[in-house]
A protein has these predicted regions:
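Aromatic-anchored segments of alpha-helical transmembrane domains
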Residues: 121-129, 210-219, 280-294
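Alpha-helical transmembrane segments and their helix-start/interface "positive-inside/aromatic belt" motifs
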Residues: 5-8, 38-50, 105-126, 197-208, ...
Length: 354
């Protein structure tokens, strides 16, 4: 269950960061009169509607796994911000529609920045609410006072020192991943040589600059964790296994630094090459995996310090259901891989400036 949770969350985070970063970058590029900038804006916008489907579909499995693993805590925190939590559905629907309008207006040569900006603000709101819930579930000491203040869940929690750095980390990570995404696009055969150079230059510089902010936010988020959590990540807990989560944090640091170096080489050197394109993809995925492993350790150790032991439970496994899930999951990945191969073999359409 844990491995499935970590795997699906990692994929979900990759899609989320692509959406958050790619959308605002598309908005900013659309404001320029540079033909290559407009080409980049349209290229990102056309892909964002697809990215949004992955954000939603890859977000459901980890939420269900989290409900099984942390049900009492997550259910309680969700009820305490119930008004905001249920509003996420409507906000996502509106964001999805705005993404299509943003793309359509760009393709028609109309001003679209304001549509994209509204969509980005709505996506950021959802990210904020999710961060709020994921941190509120770790704070049972405030649940009673919040319920007393509003039984219908009309208030958001305050006084959490970890919320701001965690949210900033996700937002900065969006631009970091968005820059790496541009590096990948610069290696696609569907763009002109001029567009490739522009994407490599801009994507590399954005990823390098925002990667530094991402690092700083990550160090800040780690620094505000309670002493018991830090000790647990160092292997000083009832479960030494969480030492691996602490080690994942150091691997995350190394991977982000490596990505910043690669991005700087490609961005400032205007390097367009297959190795930079695919290295960007590999580093982006590995960075998110390490982040998720570290994050999981922080969550479990925080709850453990408050007498919620995720491992202390009676497990009655329904192997038939587990087997069906694994078959469908692997089959779904196979179908996605086949669809990707079909797209890769299809005749390429140049995405030049309009």
């Amino acid at each position: 269950m844990k491995l499935l949770h970590l795997g699906t969350v990692s994929l979900h985070f990759v899609a989320v960061e692509m959406l958050v970063g790619g959308l605002l970058l598309a908005v900013l590029f659309s404001l320029s009169r540079n033909p290559q900038s407009n080409t980049t804006a349209r290229a990102l916008a056309r892909r964002l509607t697809v990215v949004m489907t992955y954000v939603i579909n890859l977000g459901v499995p980890p939420l269900l796994f989290a409900q099984v693993l942390y049900g009492r805590a997550l259910y309680t925190s969700s009820v305490l911000i119930g008004v905001y939590w249920i509003s996420i559905i409507g906000i996502l629907i509106l964001t999805y529609w705005l993404l299509y309008r943003f793309t359509a207006r760009l393709d028609a040569g109309k001003s679209a920045w304001w549509v994209g900006l509204i969509a980005w603000l709505l996506a950021g709101t959802v990210a904020r609410l999710l961060s709020t819930n994921m941190t509120l579930m770790l704070r049972p000491e405030v649940w009673r006072s919040m319920y007393s203040a509003s039984a219908m869940g009309a208030y958001l929690p305050t006084g959490d020192p970890t919320l701001e750095p965690r949210w900033l980390m996700m937002m900065a990570g969006g631009f970091f991943i968005g820059g790496l995404w541009l590096l990948y696009l610069s290696g696609r055969a569907t763009f002109t040589a001029e567009a490739k150079i522009y994407m490599a230059a801009m994507g590399g510089r954005i990823a390098a600059g925002c990667g530094i902010v991402y690092l700083a936010a990550g160090v800040w988020a780690a620094g505000v964790q309670p002493a018991s959590v830090k000790a647990g990540l160092a292997g000083q807990s009832a479960y030494p296994l969480y030492r691996l989560s602490g080690d994942a944090g150091y691997v995350w640091l190394a991977l982000v630094v490596a990505a910043v170096v690669v991005a700087a080489i490609a961005g400032f050197g205007k390097v367009v090459a297959a190795w930079t394109s695919w290295t960007a993809v590999l580093l982006a995925v590995l960075v998110e995996i390490m982040l998720v492993v570290y994050r999981d350790g922080v969550r479990d150790l925080t709850l453990l310090s408050k007498n919620y032991d995720v491992w202390d439970r009676v497990v009655v496994t329904n192997w038939g259901v587990v087997g069906l899930f694994l078959v469908l999951f692997v089959g779904g990945l196979g179908v996605i891989g086949w669809l990707v191969s079909v797209v890769a073999r299809a005749q390429k359409v140049m995405e030049g400036a309009a």
